[in-house]
Each structure stands twice: as structure tokens, then as C-alpha cells.
């Protein structure tokens, strides 16, 4: 989206605030329904980030798949659960929480130190040199496929990792 600088910055700050407040709501709200709605806000803000980055297809996929399907499924599942189960054995801090926070903090620190040292410019040029010329493609689905593995490789991989985590979480919940 080609916007003037101040408007783009304002929208970026507005989306960041929505993302931060929504993610804090997911973590800290005691009612699972409110947490699910906060998750919907987070996923909606992520799709708006993709629109600001001129990646409209990924934004539409994010909106349809995550907000429209996954979040509605989570809300549907939470509504069928017994609400009193959540408050029976409520501890503020457990050993598992400490281990999880240490693992997440170490992963965050390693990503923060690794990402600035990565040569993203070289990665972009290697994908551009292997790119198929779009005018030779027959259908739009082939063009979308080429864009997903070249121009939108990083968002595509992040979405696939999020789907994998959701699948593993669903399996873990189903086994209990």
C-alpha cells in the first residue's frame, strides 16, 4: 500500500498497539472466551500488517483461514467446555511455566541476536535469479505459487510453522 510517510507510520503504530494489547489479552484474561476474541484481534492485526506490506494474497489468506476458520473453531470449542474446569487447580506460577518462560526467553534472545547479522539482501537476490518469468505462466494459480516461494517465502514459512504448532496443540489437547 503506497501511503505517505506519516499516514503509514500512524497505521503501523496503531496496528502495533492492537497487536500488543490483543496478545496481552490472550495471555492475561482469565475467561477463555475473551482470550479467544483477543486472539481474533491479534490475527486481524497481522492480516492488516500484510496489507501494509503490499502482500494482499497473504493478507486475505490470513484473514480467511485464521480469523475466519481457526479462531471461530477455537471459540466454538471453548464454548462447549465446562467453564468451572479452568478454575479448580489455579496456581499463579508452576515449574512448567518457569521452564517455558526460560525456553521462550532464550529463543527470543537468540533470534534478536541472529536476525540483524543475517544478510537478507543476498537471500532476496538468490531467489530473484531463480525466479520463473511470470508472463510465460499459464494460470494465476501458478503465479501465486511462484510468488509464495520467491517473493513471499518468509511469510509463507511463518504461516506454515504457525499451522504446524496449531496442529500439534490440537493433537495434545485431543489426547488429554
Swiss-Prot record:
The keyword Manganese does not apply. It is a multi-pass membrane protein. The chain crosses the membrane at residues 10-30, 33-53, 61-81, 92-112, 153-173. It is found in: Plastid, Chloroplast thylakoid membrane. Keywords: Chloroplast, Membrane, NAD, NADP, Plastid, Plastoquinone, Quinone, Thylakoid, Translocase, Transmembrane, Transmembrane helix, Transport. Its EC number is 7.1.1.-. InterPro entries: NAD(P)H-Q_Oxidoreduct_6, NADH_UbQ/plastoQ_OxRdtase_su6, Nuo/plastoQ_OxRdtase_6_NuoJ. Pfam families: Oxidored_q3 (PF00499). The keyword Acetylation does not apply. One of its GO terms (molecular function) is NADH dehydrogenase (ubiquinone) activity. It catalyses: a plastoquinone + NADH + (n+1) H(+)(in) = a plastoquinol + NAD(+) + n H(+)(out); a plastoquinone + NADPH + (n+1) H(+)(in) = a plastoquinol + NADP(+) + n H(+)(out). GO terms for cellular component: chloroplast thylakoid membrane. Its main location: plastid. NDH shuttles electrons from NAD(P)H:plastoquinone, via FMN and iron-sulfur (Fe-S) centers, to quinones in the photosynthetic chain and possibly in a chloroplast respiratory chain. The immediate electron acceptor for the enzyme in this species is believed to be plastoquinone. Couples the redox reaction to proton translocation, and thus conserves the redox energy in a proton gradient. Belongs to the complex I subunit 6 family. NDH is composed of at least 16 different subunits, 5 of which are encoded in the nucleus. This is NAD(P)H-quinone oxidoreductase subunit 6, chloroplastic.
Amino acid at each position: 500500500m503506497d501511503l505517505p510517510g506519516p499516514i503509514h507510520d500512524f497505521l503501523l503504530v496503531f496496528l502495533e498497539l492492537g497487536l500488543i494489547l490483543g496478545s496481552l489479552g490472550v495471555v492475561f484474561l482469565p475467561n477463555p472466551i475473551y482470550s479467544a476474541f483477543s486472539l481474533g484481534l491479534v490475527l486481524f492485526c497481522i492480516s492488516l500488517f500484510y496489507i501494509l506490506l503490499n502482500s494482499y494474497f497473504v493478507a486475505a489468506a490470513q484473514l480467511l483461514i485464521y480469523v475466519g476458520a481457526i479462531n471461530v473453531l477455537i471459540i466454538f470449542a471453548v464454548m462447549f467446555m465446562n467453564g468451572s474446569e479452568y478454575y479448580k487447580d489455579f496456581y499463579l506460577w508452576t515449574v512448567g511455566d518457569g521452564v517455558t518462560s526460560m525456553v521462550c526467553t532464550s529463543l527470543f534472545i537468540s533470534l534478536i541476536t541472529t536476525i540483524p547479522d543475517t544478510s537478507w539482501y543476498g537471500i532476496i537476490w538468490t531467489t530473484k535469479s531463480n525466479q520463473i518469468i511470470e508472463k510465460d505462466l499459464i494460470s494465476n494459480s501458478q503465479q501465486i505459487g511462484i510468488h509464495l516461494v520467491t517473493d513471499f517465502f518468509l511469510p509463507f514459512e511463518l504461516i506454515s510453522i504457525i499451522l504446524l504448532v496449531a496442529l500439534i496443540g490440537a493433537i495434545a489437547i485431543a489426547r488429554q
